[in-house]
């Protein structure tokens, strides 16, 4: 404990804007796919709960990490 080592981020801060953009675009794609999937169903009696949950889970994960890196890009360190 005499000598403390400096913390180094696992992700280079120079790639935060690019990473945020890519993650937000992928999340927006999954969100659009989810809305199109729900609206274009022929009958509402179809049981597609698992597929809807998986698409929405992917969308929320990508959008969540995209927003975190967007906040880091603009200087809001969370």
UniProtKB/Swiss-Prot annotation:
Recall the GO molecular function terms of this protein's record: oligosaccharyltransferase complex binding
Record localization: Nucleus outer membrane; Cytoplasm; Endoplasmic reticulum membrane
The record's annotation in Pfam families points to: Ost5
Q: Which residues lie on this side of the membrane: Perinuclear space?
A: 75-78
Q: What biological-process GO terms show up in the record?
A: nuclear envelope organization; nuclear migration; response to endoplasmic reticulum stress
One GO cellular component assignment for this chain's record is: cytoplasm
Q: Which UniProt keywords apply?
A: Cytoplasm, Endoplasmic reticulum, Membrane, Nucleus, Transmembrane, Transmembrane helix
Annotated family: Belongs to the OST5 family.
Q: What is this protein called?
A: Transmembrane protein 258
Q: Origin organism of this chain?
A: Drosophila melanogaster (Fruit fly)
């Amino acid at each position: 404990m005499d000598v403390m080592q400096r913390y180094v981020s696992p992700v280079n801060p120079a790639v935060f804007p690019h990473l945020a953009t890519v993650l937000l675009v992928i999340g927006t794609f999954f969100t659009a796919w989810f809305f199109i999937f729900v609206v274009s169903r022929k009958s509402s009696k179809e049981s597609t709960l698992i597929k809807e949950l998986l698409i929405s889970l992917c969308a929320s994960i990508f959008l969540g990490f995209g927003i975190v890196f967007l906040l880091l890009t603009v200087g809001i360190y969370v």
